[in-house]
């Protein structure tokens, strides 16, 4: 019978509570990130003589947080045969809470902890379900009379706190199927000032991750690689040298691939200018300087033209509103009805609205001399949404409907029954979608990938966006990176911001009776209350805008 010795190790992050205010609006603190000074962390150190098996494993786990010199300190805890061949980033399992070390009589130590997420060999992260557990057996062996780890699994295990300290996220950028808008594909890399430019380019040239399969393309001709397996950075200039295969790209694709490179490298603070070479000569891109600024390609940004005013409802009528003025729309058809919520496309030539009883959904396309309308019937329609492809989305009871090019398009979601879908909110790039779904844990916020053809839309690879949050009632995209959502786990309801690049949530404020949020970068944020009034966020304060409800912006 095996005997177990129990050791507890604290490698965890302490959650921060909210900051109460006197008013009904309450500011909050970051949840899931690592505030400065909130962790007492063991500094990575080399193994010492006489360490017990559990001390060796504990030291290895702590040393795994340091990626300096290719995890040099962590490698010293391994048997000599493994030190040079261990590939720590083949898979990274991220745990949280308290880890337990159980020492057995068979020269092994079993480590268990709640599993937060897994980072695969291509640096993409997947969040785990709340009840997931990490169980890892470390086999040990005597080397010169000292215990060392005989690792028989790939990758490493690291606490969430140490992950946040030692790693960071970067977006790779890939064009959608129209080659007009770039979409982010998030990777997790060790914090480094020297090697990440090279690693980002290697990952970019390998193409998008599994989560974007079928939804995005790459502008690089097949076979394009780095001609020099390094991206040097000097005085703010990054030089990317590609092989001659890239010369087969037509002029427009050279623009797109340049945008992919420049936007991907722009996340590195030291890089301000990018030069793209073929061998040692500059790649010729039409109407583009040889030295490309990191702000050059804004025309490919999914947020570049989100400038239209919000629409809101007052006494059943549709109003257009901004900070200065609120005015009724000029449309005889819609002015004759009574409406629950409305939305428009970015060019404001497609208007859609849900009737006040939430049983009918009308989409009017005014791009031609005679407007064309599509009518959909259902129950419990929610607030409609538009996307960058001029598709209009609405979710009802057991129903997800999309109108595109004056036709109703069939929508399916992999792995989720429609009766469990509360709402679907397309992203500004039109490639991703937020989903509010009923799960065994409550109402959760998830994210999926939109794959389109002429006849149908599929939402695939649905995954968790945030680790916690089981009472989500509404969500909106503020920009291609940031999502705002309402959680009514307790009153007053909490309003959170989540960074889709990192998964970090921040509690912004709380407000009694919160029902609907509308927010776009550089535009006012609107909050609908249950009493039928609307608040606008202005210079850090909430200002009442009167009896208006259900504000929306074009997607």
Stretches found by the model and what they are:
Residues 6-10:
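Hydrophobic helical h-region of N-terminal Sec-dependent signal peptides
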Residues 1-4:
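Positively charged n-region of N-terminal signal peptides that target proteins for export
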């Amino acid at each position: 019978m095996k005997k177990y010795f129990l050791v507890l190790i604290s490698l965890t992050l302490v959650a921060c509570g909210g900051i109460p205010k006197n008013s009904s609006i309450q500011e909050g603190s970051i949840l899931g990130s690592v505030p400065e000074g909130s962790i007492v962390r063991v500094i990575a150190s080399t193994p010492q003589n006489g360490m017990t098996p559990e001390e060796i494993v504990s030291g290895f786990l702590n040393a795994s947080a340091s990626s300096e010199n290719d995890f040099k300190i962590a490698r010293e805890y391994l048997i000599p045969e493994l030190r040079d061949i261990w590939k720590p980033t083949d898979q990274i399992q991220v745990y949280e809470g308290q880890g337990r070390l159980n020492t057995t009589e068979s020269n092994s130590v079993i480590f268990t902890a709640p599993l937060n997420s897994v980072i695969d060999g291509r640096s993409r992260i997947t969040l785990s379900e709340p009840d997931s557990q990490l169980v890892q057996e470390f086999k040990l062996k005597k080397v010169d009379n000292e215990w060392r780890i005989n690792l028989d699994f790939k990758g490493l295990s690291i606490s969430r706190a140490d992950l946040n300290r030692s790693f960071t996220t970067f977006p790779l950028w890939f064009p959608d199927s129209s080659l007009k808008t770039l979409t982010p594909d998030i990777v997790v890399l060790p914090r480094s000032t020297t090697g990440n430019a090279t690693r980002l380019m290697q990952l970019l040239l390998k193409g998008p991750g599994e989560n974007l399969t079928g939804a995005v393309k790459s502008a690089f001709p097949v076979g394009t690689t780095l001609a020099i397996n390094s991206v040097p950075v000097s005085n703010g200039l990054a030089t990317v040298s590609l092989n001659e295969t890239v010369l087969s790209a037509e002029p427009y694709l050279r623009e797109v691939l340049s945008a992919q490179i420049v936007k991907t490298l722009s996340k590195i603070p030291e890089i301000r200018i990018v030069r793209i070479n073929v061998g040692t000569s500059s790649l010729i891109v039409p109407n583009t300087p040889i030295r490309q600024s990191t702000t050059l390609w804004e025309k490919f940004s999914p947020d570049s033209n989100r400038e239209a005013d919000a629409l809101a409802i007052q006494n059943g009528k549709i109003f257009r509103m901004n900070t200065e003025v609120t005015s009724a729309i000029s449309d005889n058809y819609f002015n004759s009805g009574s409406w629950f919520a409305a939305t428009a496309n970015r060019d404001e030539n497609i208007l859609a609205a849900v009737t006040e009883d939430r049983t009918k959904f009308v989409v009017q396309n005014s791009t031609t001399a005679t407007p064309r309308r599509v009518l959909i019937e259902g129950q419990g329609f929610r607030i409609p949404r538009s996307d960058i492809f001029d598709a209009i989305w609405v979710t009802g009871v057991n129903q997800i409907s999309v109108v595109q090019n004056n036709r109703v398009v069939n929508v399916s979601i992999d792995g989720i029954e429609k009766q469990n879908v509360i709402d679907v909110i397309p992203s500004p790039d039109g490639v991703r979608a937020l989903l509010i779904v009923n799960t065994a844990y409550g109402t959760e916020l998830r994210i999926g990938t939109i794959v389109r053809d002429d006849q149908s839309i599929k939402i695939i690879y649905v995954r968790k966006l945030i680790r916690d949050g089981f009472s989500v009632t509404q969500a909106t995209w503020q920009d291609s990176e940031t999502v705002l959502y309402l959680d009514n786990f307790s009153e007053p309801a909490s309003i959170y911001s989540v960074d889709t690049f990192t998964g970090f949530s921040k509690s912004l404020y709380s407000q009694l009776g919160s029902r609907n949020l509308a927010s776009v970068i550089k535009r006012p944020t609107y909050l609908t209350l249950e009493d039928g009034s609307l608040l606008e966020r202005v210079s850090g304060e909430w200002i009442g805008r009167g009896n208006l409800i259900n504000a929306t912006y074009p997607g």
